[in-house]
Amino acid sequence: YCGSRLSDVTEGNLYTVAFPMAEENNGNGTVAPAFALPGSTPWRTITVGETLKPIVETTVIWDVVEPLYETEHDYQMGRGTWSWILWQDGSINYDDQVRYVDLAAAMGYEYVLIDNWWDTKIGHKRMESLIDYAQGKGVDVFLWYSSSGYWNDIEQGPVNKMDDPIIRKREMKWLQEQGVKGIKVDFFGGDKQETMRLYEGILSDADDHGLMVIFHGCTVPRGW
């Protein structure tokens, strides 16, 4: 199904449940969802509070959903270092990432997140040695990817690795072989049904390869 939202206020100070806007995903894909019968539509919830606290802390999205899948791996959440938040694109090079691996090790953190452009500024082959270095320090690695696809024209790479199932599985196989523990997937195009399917496809394939997933530049929590 697609994601939904509250519409702008209508006559009589009413709000309605609205489907995605046509221009989402650069205008590609359908606005109206479809599914085979018998079927059911998702829960729709609204959280209201005088402050942001109840909105941030609510668990209702997960409380009303029965899990559709069982994970095949045990995942360990943890803390990590992330150079991009301070030094941004210029920090995505081998030497600076070694520094952030060392920082994670010194802090007793479990992970380091290496952000966009690593595929060109470090490269897959040199990344393998960086992953080995991090693991030698007791630090595991997350790598960034663009969600890509025909709806997405951003330049930051790696691109075109997550939208096609065949290419995605090939890339995740490489990640698993290197001992990468997770991925950060960024720049999603909207809330149309096609994008909801992409989220689920990424999550399912990631679990097949023992990878945790961070979604960034994405929809609000949908009960996954």
Identify the meaning behind each predicted range.
Residues Y1, Y15, Y69, Y75, ...:
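Sequence-level detector for tyrosine residue identity
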Residues P20, E24, R79, Y109, ...:
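Amphipathic, alpha-helical segments enriched in basic
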Residues N28-A32, E66, Q97, R168:
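Sparse, context-dependent recognition of short Cys/His-centered cofactor- or disulfide-binding micro-motifs
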